[in-house]
């Protein structure tokens, strides 16, 4: 569906040395999936996203969308290709002197729709995004979440195959963000639109995306199924993002002064619902103290992470046996200290 092949993007200021914003990126995005690109500010993710509709041209490499090399198009051919690619933005980009309905209708007029078909399509799409009762309101009368819904309505009005989302929730509060992500999931499921979403928040990736690419310094440092990236992050930068998202850092006081062994245990799938720690307490006679932990559900799969303290002052070998038992029953055990 979308093929990004060895894409580089360089920017030059005056006569200075070019700055490479995107560095040799290759990605394949399947039709109908929700694909996330995550990274910190300056990672190159927005620049990469803009190559998908040729708002930014690659300095090297190529971008194919629906079998067409969009990076090689211009003029009428490019305008026609862009009609199949919708885009929403962090700050909405609405026309403030036009009503909600007029904002949506504008994209249809620009695409050459027959006048008689515009009003019914506007009504249909506003119903889909939950704004049927706001058609005659102006943007200044809307909340941030409602403004983003207008942006989404405008972006999908032309029946696009692809929807590009540039930090769609970063200007919204947590509750409103969740409703916007739910709407995007609904649109993906109901209309089959391929969604490519960029964000700096792993929580957004976790809640909506099927697969993810992690960017740092203009490069894709890791990619894969969202669950796998959370469960087994390979690159140090990804590990940092996941750790920050799961928030499992122990205070230094606990790390240094608690007796016994400290373990970080990863539970995946069914093991997250099994009484593994109760088993080791009973079988090996060790004291188990849960210091930190949570269970996340990514899609329908459970991912549990616990930080625990194991002690057995009168039987030191019992702790080693308990650790080995935990290793056999769980996905991963990291000895933090001990």
Curated annotation (Swiss-Prot):
Gene of this entry: metN2
Residues in ABC transporter domain copies: 2-242
Assembly, per entry: The complex is composed of two ATP-binding proteins (MetN), two transmembrane proteins (MetI) and a solute-binding protein (MetQ).
Function: Part of the ABC transporter complex MetNIQ involved in methionine import. Responsible for energy coupling to the transport system.
Class in the EC hierarchy, top level: translocase
Protein's name according to its UniProt entry: Methionine import ATP-binding protein MetN 2
Record bears the keyword Oxidoreductase: no
Gene Ontology terms for molecular function: ABC-type D-methionine transporter activity; ATP binding; ATP hydrolysis activity
Similarity comment text for this entry: Belongs to the ABC transporter superfamily. Methionine importer (TC 3.A.1.24) family.
Xref: InterPro entries: AAA+_ATPase (IPR003593), ABC_transporter-like_ATP-bd (IPR003439), ABC_transporter-like_CS (IPR017871), ACT-like_dom_sf (IPR045865), MetN_ABC (IPR041701), MetN_ABC_transporter-like (IPR050086), NIL_domain (IPR018449), P-loop_NTPase (IPR027417)
Primary location: membrane
Keyword tags: Amino-acid transport, ATP-binding, Cell inner membrane, Cell membrane, Membrane, Nucleotide-binding, Translocase, Transport
Membrane topology type: Peripheral membrane protein
UniProt xrefs under Gene3D superfamilies: 3.30.70.260, P-loop containing nucleotide triphosphate hydrolases
Catalytic activity, as annotated: L-methionine(out) + ATP + H2O = L-methionine(in) + ADP + phosphate + H(+); D-methionine(out) + ATP + H2O = D-methionine(in) + ADP + phosphate + H(+)
EC number(s) from the headed UniProt entry: 7.4.2.11
Binding residues annotated for ATP, in chain numbering: 39-46
Source species: Salmonella paratyphi A (strain ATCC 9150 / SARB42)
């Amino acid at each position: 569906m979308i093929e990004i092949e060895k894409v580089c993007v360089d920017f030059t200021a005056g006569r200075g040395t070019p700055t490479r914003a995107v560095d040799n990126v290759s990605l394949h995005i399947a039709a109908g999936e929700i694909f996330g690109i995550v990274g910190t500010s300056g990672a190159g993710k927005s620049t990469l996203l803009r190559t998908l509709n040729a708002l930014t041209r690659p300095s090297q490499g190529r971008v194919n969308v629906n079998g067409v090399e969009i990076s090689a198009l211009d003029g009428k051919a490019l305008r026609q290709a862009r009609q199949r690619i919708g885009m929403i933005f962090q700050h909405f980009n609405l026309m403030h002197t036009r009503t909600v309905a007029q904002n949506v209708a504008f994209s249809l007029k620009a695409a050459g729709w027959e006048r008689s078909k515009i009003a019914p399509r506007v009504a249909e799409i506003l119903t889909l995004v939950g704004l049927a009762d706001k058609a005659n309101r102006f943007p200044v009368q809307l909340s941030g979440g409602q403004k983003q819904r207008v942006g989404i309505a405008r972006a999908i009005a032309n029946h696009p195959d692809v929807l590009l989302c540039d930090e769609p929730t970063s200007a919204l509060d947590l509750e409103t963000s969740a409703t916007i992500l739910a709407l995007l999931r609904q649109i993906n499921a109901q209309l089959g639109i391929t969604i490519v979403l960029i964000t700096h928040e792993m929580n957004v990736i976790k809640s909506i995306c099927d697969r993810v690419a992690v960017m740092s310094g203009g490069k894709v440092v890791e990619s894969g199924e969202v669950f796998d990236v959370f469960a087994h992050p390979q690159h140090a930068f990804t590990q940092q993002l996941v750790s920050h998202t799961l928030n499992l850092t122990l205070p230094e006081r606990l790390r240094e002064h608690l007796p016994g062994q400290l373990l970080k245990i990863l539970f995946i799938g069914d093991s997250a619902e099994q009484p593994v720690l109760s088993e080791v307490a009973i079988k090996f006679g060790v004291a188990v103290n849960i210091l930190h932990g949570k269970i996340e559900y990514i899609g329908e799969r459970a991912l549990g992470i616990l930080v625990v303290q194991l002690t057995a002052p009168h039987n030191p070998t019992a702790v080693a046996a308990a650790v080995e038992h935990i290793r056999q029953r769980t996905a991963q055990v990291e000895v933090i200290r001990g």
